[in-house]
């Protein structure tokens, strides 16, 4: 028989570091780039040439609302910390309608860090909450609250 739990793993002290919508009104999500598969950012020079600098993606609507242009340096923050990167304004991300509310997403590739052949960057998981699946202990890096401002 399989034993599983439908609840989340969240320690009491970590619950105090979860953001609130009024201060962090956007949804952050991390993802990988083909050019930087796993640790290639740190070791493969050609991939660093193809995509040399840390960036975040935002929709045209969010860019307009925040006065951010393609190529601007931005700060993305959560209750746990912040990163700085170049803004990429894209049609790939759209404003979502969730239960009648408009929701904006900030896409954050996870490959940059303090070492490697690409330009040094910030660790994307600085922003992510310390929340996980109670069965697999897999951390939740795909949906968390953030804010974004022009740097």
Predicted regions: what they are:
Residues 39-151:
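Long, contiguous, secondary-structure-rich segments that constitute the structural scaffold
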Residues 1-44:
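Long, low-complexity segments enriched in small/aliphatic residues
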